[in-house]
Amino acid sequence: GLKVGLWGGTDFTGDYKEFDYYLSYTIAGFTVAVWDIYNYSPGLPYSKDIFNYNKFSTSHFLDLSVAYNFDTKFEVPLRLYWATIFAGRDLNLEGRNRYSTYVNAEYSVYRDEHWIVDVGLGGTFAFNRGDGDGGANFYGYDGIDQISLRATYKLKLGRFDMPVFAHAMWNPDQRQGYLQVGVNLFAF
């Protein structure tokens, strides 16, 4: 089905801020989505003007993704995901779009009526690196940049489902780790 949504996030210090809009369509396990991601990341150009889409000064990038959930048809708890930045602040040194790309595979290692535990592996590359970019893409450098473990609890409050999750991610490229905690408050 068709989904239109908003997503936002920050870190505990307020150094990272994000506010996104998306449109997605899912049918028979396939999902196609377009995301408008507006964020502030230290070390990157930042515009406080949320309506600024000039590629040289914007804080936006537009992302096109496709995904397939093998569980839908084949009952295999594997999900594959591909996303490429097609517009915005993903520029090589010559000022052209790099088309930075993120690919990911996730597999559910445990499921019951209340819990889902997933492991994942993701990597990045760019289709249009500039001559002096040295293998750089929007996310860092080409290679593995996400090893993850996510636990989701299917919280039920009355007749409402509100999945709660904790997602630990390690980035070998940047030698950092992240913890994301969230709840899906509503979906329609």
PLM region descriptions:
Residues L2-A67:
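Outer-membrane beta-barrel channel domains
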Residues F51-G134, F186:
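Detector for outer-membrane/organellar transmembrane beta-barrel domains
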Residues L149-A151, L155, R175-F188:
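Outer-membrane beta-barrel "beta-signal"
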Residues G1-F12, V32-Y40, D49, V76-D90, ...:
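Transmembrane beta-strand segments that form the barrel wall of outer-membrane beta-barrel proteins
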Residues G1-L2, S24-T26, A33, D71-L78, ...:
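Short loop/turn motifs that connect adjacent beta-strands in outer-membrane beta-barrel proteins
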Residues I116-H167:
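Outer membrane beta-barrel transmembrane domains
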Residues G14-Y21, G43-F51, R89-R96, R129-Y141, ...:
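Outer-membrane beta-barrel translocator domains and adjoining extracellular loop/strand segments
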Residues D15-F19, T26-A28, T58-L62, G95-V103, ...:
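Residues that define the transmembrane beta-barrel architecture of outer-membrane proteins
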